Amino acid sequence: MADLNIVMNGDFFAGIEPWYPNGCEAFVVSSDPFSSEVMSADSSSGGYVVVTNRKETWQGLEQDITTRVASGMNYTVSTCVGVSGPFNESAEVLSTVRLEHEDSPTEYLCIGKTYASRDKWVDLEGTFSISNMPDRVVLYLEGPAPGKDLLIRSVTVRSSTSSDFQETEKNTDASNVFPLALNIIKNHDFSDGLYSWNTNGCDSFVVSSNDCNLESNAVVNNRSETWQGLEQDITDNVSPGFSYKVSASVSVSGPVLGSAQVLATLKLEHKSSATEFQLIGKTYASKDIWKTLEGTFEVSGRPDRVVFFLEGPPPGIDLLVKSVTIHCESDNQFERSREFCSAPESDNHIFLNSSFSDGLNHWSGRGCNLMLHESLADGKILPDSGTCFASASERTHKWSGIEQDITERVQRKLIYEASSVVRLSHSHHTVQATLYVQYLDQREEYIGISSVQGTHDDWVELKGKFLLNGSPARAVVYIEGPPPGIDVFVDHFAVKPAEKETPSGRPYIESHAFGMNIVSNSHLSDGTIEGWFPLGDCHLKVGDGSPRILPPLARDSLRKTQGYLSGRYVLATNRSGTWMGPAQTITDKVKLFVTYQVSAWVKIGSGGRTSPQDVNIALSVDGNWVNGGKVEVDDGDWHEVVGSFRIEKEAKEVMLHVQGPSPGVDLMVAGLQIFAVDRKARLSYLRGQADVVRKRNVCLKFSGLDPSELSGATVKIRQTRNSFPLGSCISRSNIDNEDFVDFFLNNFDWAVFGYELKWYWTEPEQGNFNYRDANEMIEFCERYNIKTRGHCIFWEVESAIQPWVQQLTGSKLEAAVENRVTDLLTRYNGKFRHYDVNNEMLHGSFYRDRLDSDARANMFKTAHELDPLATLFLNEYHIEDGFDSRSSPEKYIKLVHKLQKKGAPVGGIGIQGHITSPVGHIVRSALDKLSTLGLPIWFTELDVSSTNEHIRGDDLEVMLWEAFAHPAVEGVMLWGFWELFMSREHSHLVNADGEVNEAGKRFLEIKREWLSFVDGEIEDGGGLEFRGYHGSYTVEVVTSESKYVTNFVVDKGNSPVDVIIDL
């Protein structure tokens, strides 16, 4: 038997005695406030306590335990708590021990804390020990803010010298395999209720039988995620180097169709590194049938905490557990177990027979035939390594290829690396490694791991990473890509846990001068082209008549009010290719990881004015093209071209050149400037701008107390949330990962779906609708009060449109468009605050070309009729960086005016924000131009990319402050933040294992900087003035008599505002 509970009346069966409310009131209620189900405590439970009329955080419920504790002993405290009151956020609850001494100050020991919400019970656990026995020992529960009621269902305090460890286990279904071994699980058969067990984000209770010959079992209910279940801390009972056998008797209940997966998992927590999850075993359980779940594990290293837990069934299905045993085995037993289970290869590969040394065992063909070869093509194709390779022939589809099922060996939330060497029978095509996943609820997902351009001439490496958010019913990795009829050769194919990468340090940046032009002879002051050379067979010479002032954005960035150009320009003639033009080598002048701004005057000759011509400032970095800015020119005027770039890898040669117009068109360039930008100076300016745009003067006026008591009282003002909207892109699989969900909910208040609302996803085939993912994501957002953007109703770019729509014309296409917008907005009426109506209209023209000229405007009109409260947006990329001549701010403004002229109810301007090496002045210029439309501007898909996390953080800081400091910008959406779930490489803020990287830390620092904190005293007039950001605040007032805490809101606005604080 376990040790007795030293707390008296721990289940409140006898009412409130001998508990004592500390400065507040308490009473016992007999019904469960959160559920009509059986309560989680024993069947003898008397109900729960409500601690109310709390005016201080430390007020709660306490009990004197002096006579029932002793020095030198360790005690484990376990409580079941909740909160109640008029609030939505979670509240902190603490368990504390007060040690009172007659001859020395009182001590306080924090035992543990948790966060409770209004809708469910949570467990609060911890331990304490007493070194020297005090005069009085008091256990109490405290913590929620004043005004919030504290609910307590049970309290237990037990000595940790429980005799559970010494008991011989009962001969149950789950433990009779090892009747002589010692079970390290406490309370393995729930004969002592839920003692030593905890629920993981859900509820549980024990069903006890009145027949002493029948066992009890635990019921885990109110599960909203697959990973939620029952867990026990076994840290002190396992050791590295030993193997352990797990056996559990499990079942399921609820709306089960067929069987449901149940998993046994080990969680290894480390203070200095990411938490690891180790799959022990799995089984499939059905209603009313008990199944035995077995597996083995071994603890490597020395984790700070080891937790065993059971999880797996889909949300809404209850998990039943009758008994759990974990026995230590000998090393030899463990090795035999590994062999019997066909464990992965010795290097931790989860693929079996990766190099085909055992023939084609464990491999299968996905819509193709598999064969092994020592050579092909008369010995011209030989293995890249080893003695043989496999071929996938007679492929019937692009997705046909070699595959292996890894269901039994893959773990969720663990990063895997897949690598292969591939070759094609002929031609050149993309080869891709893909992971197919089917979940227990029949939902399917295809995860692209990596792709490479495969060739007939040589072997090429295919390498990438993947991670599973949820627990799969089936997981298969395969190689696909080339058209049917092309054979794919595979030399080896391995999948193994990825090695943890070393975080990047802040790079060393060589000394450089901000604003110094690194282009030689840019002004052409002496009338020669020294420093310049022609790229290609064109001719260069110096001409006169160009502007004598710097281009506008160069002036802004360099803070120069007067120009000093010579009025000369480089003229390139006899151009026979678009790439030909003036060039110079700048290898020694470019510093790694420095962001450079590009600015120049450009003009074209008369021969190119019959059609628009692109002019591009470009760099060739070891032969690779880097965009430095592009502008469209269709007249004889001088135009400014702007852009930016950064080089992050040592280069042997960096060449600057100007290119773009059609062959035969003369090209003129004047005043080309390339200079390092001073980001620190810009950020200092933006902070000042944000103070004007996002703050207002606030006067707190306090009432309810005597003026004499208020005068001189200290005040602490803490902003808890900035009202500036900040959101992120999420996908359906993301919300299966509790670590992802935790970061998202703590840092964002808006969401946009990556692809689940797009037409190609919701209706991949005509009449075949798929709204399941979107429905589940909307439900998730509503559950946590997350506002949503609808992205997108239509997409104008043809490559993003599903084949069946591409094949429609005329009235059939018009009807499909009408059905799409009607179905979507009727189905989700009022669910989305924004809609991107027709994505990327500056880059595509599918609907405009096939329907009448009013089609685009009609999309807006119909959407507004169906959901008049939703704000309707345009959405475009490269608006803010100068990289794309098709999507300049001027062209965007022209598109808006054209739609408005046709009656389209355009409500907002979306700038996607997929930006590289951003320059604040260029971004600000675009925002200033767009703001003339008088419409709200949102960054809708913001991400930045850099191989270095610190530089990535710098880029993100530039973009967030530019948005925050501009009065026309009303919100920012990130296009994701989690590694392996981003659309661009090197753009994540959180590593796949849940660790926040340096870029993510910068993001969190910026969020903290957007909060206002004030300490002061109430003035004689009973008020206190401060200037703070718009948003939610808490204020604490401490007078000579008492302390008061309340909340208030500073609404958006510029004029001073009075806020009445009633104490």
From Swiss-Prot:
Write the Enzyme Commission number(s) for this entry. Answer: 3.2.1.8
Q: Name a biological process GO annotation.
A: xylan catabolic process
Active site location: E840, E941
Q: Which Pfam families match?
A: CBM_4_9, Glyco_hydro_10
Question: Under which main EC class is this enzyme filed?
Answer: hydrolase
Q: Does the keyword Signal apply?
A: no
- Gene Ontology MF: a single term: endo-1,4-beta-xylanase activity
Q: Where is the GH10 domain?
A: 711-1006
Question: Per UniProt, which keywords does this protein have?
Answer: Carbohydrate metabolism, Glycosidase, Hydrolase, Polysaccharide degradation, Repeat, Xylan degradation
* Associated pathway: Glycan degradation; xylan degradation
Keyword set includes Hydrolase: yes
Read off the InterPro entries from this record.
CenC_carb-bd, Galactose-bd-like_sf, GH10, GH10_AS, GH10_dom, Glycoside_hydrolase_SF
Query: Which comment does the entry carry about domains?
Result: The GH10 domain binds to xylan.
Task: Tell me the function of this protein.
Answer: Binds to and hydrolyzes insoluble and soluble xylan substrates.
**What is this protein's name?**
Endo-1,4-beta-xylanase 2
Origin species, per record, is Arabidopsis thaliana
